Amino acid sequence: MKRFMQIWKPAVVGFLLLTLVCGVIYPGVVTIIAGAAFQDKANGSIIEGKLADGETGKYGSTEIGQTFTQPEYLIGRAASDGAATNLNPTSEEQKQLVEKRITWWHKLDPANNRVIPMDLVTASASGVDPDISEAAAAYQVDRISRERGISTKVVKEIIAENTSKRLLGFWGEPTVNVLQVNVALDSLKM
């Protein structure tokens, strides 16, 4: 029994010590630092404001794509709806999904005869991308303007205000945050 305790005591003490350090102390310290240094991001980048019913509430997170399908809103990338988003670009299933989405866009805005930007008919890898390209936002300006009864200039200004530029001026592409644009559009009528 003594030999058993000599072998197992260091293992159990080591296990408990590592559990305390790695499972409690380290995550606690990192959470406190993140909460203090990056308060908005550490709490999910939640947008709060006046909702349509006049109450103050939470719209959603700027980091997770929201589903908007009403014509008066800027509409984001196609949601994955729990399906695989890593389909082969040449697969028949992917082709059918894209054709279905193209048909949906034409029904939503029959007056728009421009080419639909690729990111509006394909899902992102995560399926919850909060941003779209500037081309995808520009494609929707006339419809939003018409549906809300506001000028295209106002819609373009709101989109420009909610566009992230290239990282370091050259890395990546500018993107438009769909939720931030829609919150700004809704704030116009309040």
Swiss-Prot record:
Protein name: Potassium-transporting ATPase KdpC subunit
Species this protein is from: Listeria innocua serovar 6a (strain ATCC BAA-680 / CLIP 11262)
UniProt cross-references to Pfam families, sorted A to Z: KdpC (PF02669)
Summary of the function given for this chain in its UniProt record: Part of the high-affinity ATP-driven potassium transport (or Kdp) system, which catalyzes the hydrolysis of ATP coupled with the electrogenic transport of potassium into the cytoplasm. This subunit acts as a catalytic chaperone that increases the ATP-binding affinity of the ATP-hydrolyzing subunit KdpB by the formation of a transient KdpB/KdpC/ATP ternary complex.
UniProt keyword terms in alphabetical order: ATP-binding, Cell membrane, Ion transport, Membrane, Nucleotide-binding, Potassium, Potassium transport, Transmembrane, Transmembrane helix, Transport
Subunit structure: The system is composed of three essential subunits: KdpA, KdpB and KdpC.
Assigned protein family: Belongs to the KdpC family.
Membrane topology (UniProt): Single-pass membrane protein
GO CC annotations, alphabetized: plasma membrane
Location(s), subcellular: Cell membrane
Segments traversing the membrane: 13-33
Record GO terms (molecular function): ATP binding; P-type potassium transmembrane transporter activity
Phylogenetic classification of the source organism: Bacteria, Bacillati, Bacillota, Bacilli, Bacillales
Domain of life according to the entry: Bacteria
Gene from which the chain derives: kdpC
